[in-house]
Swiss-Prot record:
Taxonomic source organism: Methylibium petroleiphilum (strain ATCC BAA-1232 / LMG 22953 / PM1)
Record bears the keyword Ribonucleoprotein: yes
Pfam families membership: Ribosomal_L18p
One MF term in the entry's GO annotations: structural constituent of ribosome
Subunit structure: Part of the 50S ribosomal subunit; part of the 5S rRNA/L5/L18/L25 subcomplex. Contacts the 5S and 23S rRNAs.
GO CC terms: cytosolic large ribosomal subunit
Gene assigned in the entry: rplR
Name assigned to this protein: Large ribosomal subunit protein uL18
Family listed: Belongs to the universal ribosomal protein uL18 family.
Entries under NCBIfam families matching the protein: L18_bact (TIGR00060)
Gene3D superfamilies named in the record: 3.30.420.100
UniProt keywords, alphabetically: Ribonucleoprotein, Ribosomal protein, RNA-binding, rRNA-binding
Gene Ontology biological-process annotations: translation
Length: 121
């Protein structure tokens, strides 16, 4: 019997294989209880082209005194920041790799904010 983490990792492996066959950059998401992290990784998987997270000093300052990065507002902010950084790096289109997490809540907020900021997936 697999635990929740192993189940999530198993789902993410299947997704990464499908994305690798597409030969496009991928937007990966990792969600912890306290923070959310997003990275744009090159199509061959060898290089991180852009990244953003709620653990960054500027983001924590913008989120306020509590610095809460575990909510949908913080995820939306990270989605906007990752889209801006990806576009600055010359990336217009990516494949969304949710890392085995359900497309709901913070993951969905990040994805929708990235789309609104001009990143296509």
């Amino acid at each position: 019997m697999l635990n929740r983490k192993d189940q999530r990792l198993r789902r993410s492996k299947q997704t990464r294989v499908r994305i690798a066959l597409q030969k496009v950059a991928r937007l990966t998401v990792f969600r912890s209880n306290l923070h959310i992290y997003a990275s744009v990784i090159s199509d061959d998987g060898s290089k991180v082209l852009a990244s953003a997270s709620t653990a960054e000093k500027e983001v924590r300052a913008r989120l306020g005194a509590a610095g809460k990065g575990g909510n949908t507002e913080a995820a939306a902010l990270i989605g906007k920041r990752i889209a801006e950084r990806a576009k600055a790096a010359g990336i217009e289109s990516v494949a969304f790799d949710r890392g085995g997490f359900a497309y709901h809540g913070r993951v969905k907020a990040l994805a929708e904010a990235a789309r609104e900021a001009g990143l296509q997936f």
